[in-house]
């Protein structure tokens, strides 16, 4: 808290000092505001004159934190292709005849971190404009844009099942998380009512709550994450309305499961299950496409310090900078 206060004070105090050669007043602020045994690194750089004005422990290495999101955003925006949208596409092979797609459907992920339920519906609406109601082949997800590492470098394994640590995939749906709304019952001891968004059979729910019953224990929302399960469990005392998020395992499968569910809801006969494979290089045609403006991704990245959006932006930088079809996070850093 004191470190945050120091940064805020520095920001205000430095404003009248811009353009002055002597910034030694910062030293007294550091001594006065910084708690004993804590550390801070400061570098004041004049972008116009291209020279350093003040440094304090500026070369000391620390574990990277959310300040890296600023560097990621600046790097992404500095590119000539910065305005290119994040895309999710549906392709097909084979032919459409007699109300049947005699071929396969491919959903190609472009690591859109803002792809939500409404966007899924829009993508489905495009698909059903084609003259078929049966898919005789398979439905595949293409997640080949990035490697299979589903957490960013340095992420703590025990932060799951928090929603700020989703399982990364080029096919993200609702940020790889479920929003759980819990409403206490009318009588003490009643089981609270629970609703979830997005609704899906991909996950199950166990409700062990009690309304205004302290003996039921502290309220908790979790998931059987140690076994990579998707049974959401809500337990404990519910005294007021609550709305929380929990991640699910894994994001690519969550997307594809929801995609098939919504095709079925529109009357399309689809296979019982889905698979994952890369889109063939030849013999395919595009069926649908959703584009998310980069500004929407940046807003969430910078204003909400969104981990998912930062990783998606890093992956995008890697793809644009290297020209590779398959990238890793390291490709965006080097």
Task: Enumerate the predicted regions with their spans.
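Beta-lactamase-like hydrolase cores
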Residues: 20-60, 86, 126-130
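Soluble periplasmic/extracytoplasmic beta-strand elements of cell-envelope proteins
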Residues: 41-45, 55, 104-108, 138-142, ...
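Solvent-exposed loop/turn segments at secondary-structure junctions
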Residues: 48-49, 60-63, 96, 111-115, ...
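Polar, glycine-rich mid-to-C-terminal structural blocks
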Residues: 108-218
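Active-site SXXK
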Residues: 50, 64-82, 139, 171, ...
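A small/polar active-site loop signature that marks catalytic segments
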Residues: 213-334
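Short, well-structured active-site flanking segments
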Residues: 78-93, 102, 272-273
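Bacterial Sec-dependent N-terminal signal peptides
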Residues: 1-25
